[in-house]
Swiss-Prot record:
Function: Component of the RAVE complex which is required for stable assembly of the vacuolar ATPase complex V-ATPase.
Subunit structure: Component of the RAVE complex composed of rav1, rav2 and skp1.
Name of the protein in question: Regulator of V-ATPase in vacuolar membrane protein 2
Keyword Nucleus: yes
Pfam families documented for this protein: Rogdi_lz
Localization annotation: Cytoplasm; Nucleus
InterPro entries associated with the record: RAVE2/Rogdi
Domain of life of the source: Eukaryota
Gene disruption phenotype: Leads to mild sensitivity to a range of drugs including doxorubicin, cycloheximide, and bleomycine, as well as to calcium.
Native organism: Schizosaccharomyces pombe (strain 972 / ATCC 24843) (Fission yeast)
Gene Ontology biological process terms, A to Z: cellular response to calcium ion; vacuolar proton-transporting V-type ATPase complex assembly
Any single Gene Ontology cellular-component annotation: cytosol
Keywords: Cytoplasm, Nucleus
Amino acid sequence: MQTEIDASVIVKEKEWLETNVLPEFWESMSEGLKEALNLISSDDPTVLVFTSPKTDAVKGIVSRSSSNVVRVNVTAKVGRTTHVLKLKDSAIIHLDQILNLSNYMHYALYCLPRLRHNTERAIKELQEILHAIVCLLHSIMQEESEKEEIPSNASSISLKSQNSIVSRTSNPFSCLNHSPRQIHKTVRNHLFSPPLPSNLALSFSISNASVCLHLFRLSGPNEVLESFAKNSVDIEMLKPFVSQRIDAFSQDPILLAVTAKLSALQKKVNDVSYRFKTISSSLYGAK
């Protein structure tokens, strides 16, 4: 008799959650995703200042608009030589991490109305998508070669001391079976004016709500370096030829706001998931 009463109470609690909590939850998830998507998709340029307070290795300005870098005007000292890194006026650099981030948010918004009838599946799907997004925003490009670490107005990251993080985030899509491996590529040298010399390679990534600039000095056969300079290549291909690496980081206020919103949404999903799992396990135990 007591078991039947307990089961009845648990069923009523589950019904109350579905009636009073879930509608507001779905609405807040949809609104939060739309707000984050609008922020990250804005075409208004975000100007990022790269400075090196302890050294003068890297200094200048980078502008991001939506998922593209649209302006680069940076000076970099590599060895004894100072290079001017200036993106051509008509050129853009695609930030694949931000493009993937936008795609995931579009996918989440697409799934929400189609999965709401199946609470357990919808919550699980949202957990996976949001986990992938948060991993994507915190992914760190692995570094195995010698580099010079450059701080900026955002805290610099010691990549060699982050191996445990890299192992979890070098593939930020691993929690979704259909997702590809994140690949970091170089920028074609001819997109700059003047073009970068063939012994230099430049790449951008996103980490900890910052835009990260990675500059590589290369050594090797001229034909290999010329091939790298003409193409956008996977950073992994450069590693045998890297003699120096310089990293600079500048925190992006829009990425910071998006990260905060998505982290809050992730917490909401986890809280609702925990409540339903608790009710389900209690209901099972009462039978």
